[in-house]
UniProtKB/Swiss-Prot annotation:
Lineage: Bacteria, Pseudomonadati, Pseudomonadota, Gammaproteobacteria, Enterobacterales
Species whose genome carries this gene: Salmonella paratyphi A (strain ATCC 9150 / SARB42)
One GO cellular component term: cytosol
Keyword DNA repair attributed: yes
HAMAP family: MutS
Function (record text): This protein is involved in the repair of mismatches in DNA. It is possible that it carries out the mismatch recognition step. This protein has a weak ATPase activity.
Cited PANTHER family: DNA MISMATCH REPAIR PROTEIN MSH1, MITOCHONDRIAL, DNA MISMATCH REPAIR PROTEIN MUTS FAMILY MEMBER
Protein name in the entry: DNA mismatch repair protein MutS
GO MF term list: ATP binding; ATP-dependent DNA damage sensor activity; damaged DNA binding; mismatched DNA binding
Length: 855
């Protein structure tokens, strides 16, 4: 668009001058410019929109001597087009006509009333109902990062201060913001490159004093001590920029944003980006949502419940008091699931409706849904009243009753309101006397027109005469062409059609003016009454938000009760003793997709048994066994029941996974480099209370390098860090670790080989595996028989060269699989270069001492 911008607008028409001035205020984003029933785009905006939305690009005359590229969309379909643009990461400024065309001498007055961006949308047509839509801001200084997130559709405002790059990367993956604000001098661009909705902001928006002032103004406070964020300067810098951006885009007050909460690492189990990805919590490795933990666990009946459950899954809490309360609630609700869920389903997405109420963008159907949600509360209270559980009763109290608001909306809004207030017919009859009077006048038109038609037919004797109305010409009397010559003299021709003539008479014109006036006044009054409803509802916003949060939590807990009953989960026991003891544990996702019974397995990790070396064939179930342990721990720490017969679990501060890897081509990192980076992160950050899953360390390099790295990593985790570790490997040398270190044990997953076939038992047994079964798995995968045959020959050759290769000790001298020559010692090299015939007796004696020192 810049190519067409003329800073001197005088060459343009008045309408284009107005457009260009508005566009100059929003140069980086699309401007939807309201003209009658359409939003128009001009110049480069039109070209861009035609490509993004697949709409026609036309021209609108000329301005300053140049044809103007133009594209347009009908105003009634704007939400569909906005959704397409937002999904592509675009932002749009909505410019409306605010002046009256009838009284405007020049172009109608217009102004930008809101800016729609990916992170600040609240309209249900633009949002995914079962996912949070977050706006985030990131700040960095020499001490670490500041990070703030806001869900404008709920008012949930959070900040944190990640100490290092890995923690910041994990936060970005956990929150997955739709839009991310960053300072113009942000140094770690590699951390955020490739993320959607990046917005570069000026440095002054991140100033700490401005941030404190903005936040205190928003919350109506003198300081931020009460929120526990007073000293979080880096987080506040990010939060201040974020709040300013929201105010700039929304152009309205934000009463639903009432507090800010600090998220501290010590409050939750920390999972890095690789762990979240590998455990497939809400997204599978292919980027979809099928066969994830959330897909199995989420049978919530409200969108706000679904979003809360996903937040719980990504932020397991370490406070066992909270977890035991959740367990108690789940147990107490199991008998009432079938009664509660149908009622909860009717509550809908109250959380987001309240956000639109706060932004004053709620539509008539939003208020109807709010009324419907209020109508469910008495039934929910009645059902929960009999549940003898203190946490359940606390939830019931937070839900509230809102009988007065329910009564207000039942009186004010009709049962099935139209989409928009401007369509009319939103306010119920009987709510307002004056409105009823204007409506009666407007609605009486049909009876009057029927009477007028009968009277005029009788008076004129014209049987083709009829009275009608259209939006262009208003009311008219129509007579067929064949009888039009008989029209009375007081009939004034208004319109000529092919087969008829249309007339107006003074009486009809007078009535038309009266009816149209009444319709306009009724609509204006209806809009006024609708706005007054907001004023009556908004003082209760804080209580309503608390109720929505309680209803969402109830939905999550009822859902977990249903899942526990349906999927045969058990309630885990928390203990202060380190370790995890699982009896007949199952993988929550794999057991749902199998067509055969899942083989349950035990697990025992304790201070005396901190590391399990897991061996067995490929496809034998090692990765499944490891992941199910992490998922059982994760479920326990959101308060859920777990897929096992019995679980006792101690303190866990972090979960790490080094499971599988792929090339990171975008960053120029090989599979091995990715693997080593993840391994380094674990070795630097794991503690004795961490759960660590290590799968096939050292595969991407030579046998010696890989084995040495795997051995050293296992040694470090077992001896120095003392983390609870599951260490799967194909290096059979590692099965000797239990003989050399305390707290290490061998387990294996077995298989049976019969001829060319192999049967995986998927059962975990104590001790090391007897062999790898690699060739049998290759045959099962369809590798050609001649290749398998040749591989067997080569295997026999290698085994004959180095019969003890699999059993040699790693900390002693290990023979090469390909019998490479040993490294020559310095003493041997010196002897080979020595000429004994040239030595004197004294020199020979000196050489003996020298060789002695070299050995």
């Amino acid at each position: 668009m810049n190519e067409s911008f003329d800073k001197d607008f005088s060459n343009h028409t008045p309408m284009m001058q107005q457009y260009l001035k508005l566009k100059a205020q929003h140069p980086e984003i699309l401007l939807f410019y309201r003209m009658g029933d359409f939003y128009e785009l001009f110049y480069d905006d039109a070209k861009r929109a035609s490509q993004l939305l697949d709409i026609s690009l036309t021209k609108r005359g000329a301005s300053a001597g140049e044809p103007i590229p133009m594209a347009g969309i009908p105003h009634h379909a704007v939400e569909n087009y906005l959704a397409k643009l937002v999904n592509q990461g675009e932002s749009v400024a909505i410019c409306e006509q605010i002046g009256d065309p009838a009284t405007s001498k020049g172009p109608v007055e217009r102004k930008v009333v809101r800016i729609v961006t990916p992170g600040t949308i609240s309209d249900e047509a633009l949002l995914q109902e079962r996912q949070d839509n977050l706006l985030a801001a990131i700040w960095q200084d020499g001490k670490g990062y500041g990070y703030a997130t806001l869900d404008i559709s709920s008012g949930r405002f959070r900040l944190s201060e990640p100490a290092d790059r890995e923690t910041m990367a994990a936060e970005l993956q956990r929150t997955n913001p739709a839009e991310l604000l960053y300072a113009e001098d942000f140094a770690e661009m590699a951390l955020i490159e490739g993320r959607r909705g990046l917005r570069r902001r000026p440095l002054w928006e991140f100033e700490i004093d401005t941030a404190r002032q903005q936040l205190n103004l928003q919350f109506g406070t003198r300081d931020l001590v009460g929120f526990g964020v007073e000293n979080a300067s880096r987080g506040l810098c990010a939060a201040g920029c974020l709040l300013q951006y929201v105010k700039d885009t929304q152009r309205t007050s934000l009463p639903h944003i009432r507090s800010i909460t600090m998220e501290r690492q010590q409050d939750s189990i920390i999972m890095d980006a690789a762990t979240r990805r590998n455990l497939e919590i809400t997204q599978n490795l292919a980027g979809g949502v099928e066969n994830t933990l959330a897909a199995v666990l989420d049978c919530t009946v409200t969108p706000m419940g679904s979003r809360m459950l996903k937040r719980w899954l990504h932020m397991p809490v370490r406070n066992t008091d909270i977890l035991r309360e959740r367990q108690q609630t789940i147990g107490a609700l199991q008998d009432t699931v079938s009664e509660l869920q149908p009622v909860l389903r009717q509550v809908g997405d109250l959380e987001r409706i309240l956000a639109r109420l706060a932004l004053r963008t709620a539509r008539p159907r939003d208020l109807a849904r709010m009324r419907h949600a209020f109508q469910q509360l008495p039934e929910l209270h009645a059902q929960l009243e009999t549940v003898g559980s203190a946490p359940v009763q606390a939830l019931r109290k937070k839900m509230g009753d809102f009988a007065e608001l329910r009564d207000l909306l039942e009186r004010a809004i009709i049962d099935a309101p139209p989409v928009l207030v401007r369509d009319g017919g939103v306010i119920a009859p009987g709510y307002h006397e004056e409105l009823d009077e204007w409506r009666a006048l407007a609605d009486g038109a049909t009876d009057y027109l029927d009477r007028l038609e009968i009277r005029e037919r009788e008076r004129t004797g014209l049987d083709t005469l009829k009275v009608g109305y259209n939006a262009v010409h208003g009311y008219y009397i129509q007579i067929s062409r064949g009888q039009s010559h008989l029209a009375p003299i007081n009939y004034v021709r208004r319109q000529t059609l092919k087969n008829a003539e249309r007339y107006i008479i003074p009486e009809l014109k007078e009535y038309e003016d009266k009816v149209l006036t009444s319709k306009g006044k009724a609509l204006a009054l209806e809009k006024q009454l609708y706005d007054e409803l907001f004023d009556l509802l908004l003082p209760h916003l804080a209580d309503l938000q608390q109720s929505a949060n309680a209803l969402a939590e109830l939905d999550v807990l009822v859902n977990l009760a249903e899942r526990a009953w349906t999927l045969n989960y058990t309630c885990p026991t928390f203990t202060d003793k380190p370790g995890i003891r699982i009896t007949e544990g199952r993988h929550p996702v794999v057991e749902q997709v199998l067509n055969e019974p899942f083989i349950a397995n035990p697990l025992n990790l304790s201070p005396q048994r901190r590391m399990l070396i897991i061996t067995g064939p490929n496809m034998g179930g090692k990765s499944t066994y490891m992941r199910q342990t992490a998922l059982i721990a994760l479920l326990a720490y959101i308060g859920s029941y777990v897929p096992a017969q019995n679980v006792e679990i101690g303190p866990i501060d972090r979960i790490f996974t080094r499971v599988g890897a792929a090339d990171d081509l975008a960053s120029g990192r090989s599979t091995f480099m990715v693997e080593m980076t993840e391994t380094a992160n674990i070795l630097h950050n794991a503690t004795e209370n961490s759960l660590v899953l290590m799968d096939e360390i050292g595969r991407g390099t030579s046998t010696y390098d890989g084995l040495s790295l795997a051995w050293a990593c296992a040694e470090n985790l077992a001896n120095k860090i003392k983390a609870l570790t599951l260490f799967a490997t194909h290096y059979f040398e590692l099965t000797q670790l239990p003989e050399k270190m305390e707290g290490v044990a061998n387990v294996h997953l077995d298989a049976l080989e019969h001829g060319d076939t192999i049967a995986f038992m998927h059962s975990v047994q104590d001790g090391a595996a007897s062999k790898s079964y690699g060739l049998a798995v290759a045959a099962l995968a369809g590798v050609p028989k001649e290749v398998i045959k040749r591989a067997r020959q080569k295997l026999r050759e290698l085994e004959s060269i180095s019969p003890n290769a699999a059993a040699t000790q790693v900390d002693g001298t290990q023979m090469s699989l390909l019998a490479a020559p040993e490294e020559t010692s310095p003493a041997v090299e010196a002897l080979e270069n020595l000429d004994p015939d040239s030595l004197t007796p004294r020199q020979a004696l000196e050489w003996i001492y020298r060789l002695k020192s070299l050995v």
